[in-house]
Amino acid sequence: MAAAADSFSGGPAGVRLPRSPPLKVLAEQLRRDAEGGPGAWRLSRAAAGRGPLDLAAVWMQGRVVMADRGEARLRDPSGDFSVRGLERVPRGRPCLVPGKYVMVMGVVQACSPEPCLQAVKMTDLSDNPIHESMWELEVEDLHRNIP
C-alpha cells in the first residue's frame, strides 16, 4: 500500500510523490537559485546566508498563457514557467483556459532556460482575486521565515 502513496499513476512517465510538503516558489527563484537535476533539485539560499532547501515538490501559481495537449505555459509575477502531464491530473482540464489563475503542485523537471514542472495537482483560483494579489508576498514571507 505504501508504494501506491509514493507514485502518481500515469504509466512510464509516472511521478514519484514526495513525502514533504511542496515549497512555494516563484519562477525566478528556480531560474536563478536552483541547483542539481531531476529528482535532486535544491534551492540555494547562500545569498541570505542560509543552507539550501530540497525541492522535492513545489507549489507555484500563475495565469495560464497557453495550453495544449496536456501541457501549459503559465506566468507568475517573476516570469513564465511550463507544466506538463496535465492530462493525468484531476481537475487539470477545467483549469486549462488562457487567462485563468491557477495553482499547480508539481515535481521540478528543469529550471533553465525556464522552470518546467511535472504536474501532480492543479486547481483554479480565478474566483478570488486575493490569491493572485497576495501570491508574491506569501512566497516572500515564507522564505523569510524558513530557518
Curated annotation (Swiss-Prot):
Pfam families in alphabetical order: RMI2
A single GO molecular function term of this UniProt record: DNA binding
Predominant location category: nucleus
Any one biological process term the GO annotation gives: regulation of sister chromatid segregation
Positions of modified residues (Phosphoserine): S7
DNA-binding positions: 44-114
Region described as Disordered: spans on this chain: 1-20
Single GO cellular component term: RecQ family helicase-topoisomerase III complex
Protein keywords: Acetylation, DNA replication, DNA-binding, Nucleus, Phosphoprotein
Function, as annotated: Essential component of the RMI complex, a complex that plays an important role in the processing of homologous recombination intermediates. It is required to regulate sister chromatid segregation and to limit DNA crossover. Essential for the stability, localization, and function of BLM, TOP3A, and complexes containing BLM. In the RMI complex, it is required to target BLM to chromatin and stress-induced nuclear foci and mitotic phosphorylation of BLM.
Disease with which this protein is associated in UniProt: A homozygous deletion of RMI2 has been found in a family with a Bloom-like syndrome and is probable responsible for the phenotype. Patients manifest depigmented skin lesions, multiple cafe-au-lait macules, and growth deficiency. Cells from affected individuals show a high rate of sister chromatid exchange and increased chromosomal breaks.
Protein name as catalogued: RecQ-mediated genome instability protein 2
UniProt source species: Homo sapiens (Human)
Top-level taxonomy: Eukaryota, Metazoa, Chordata, Craniata, Vertebrata
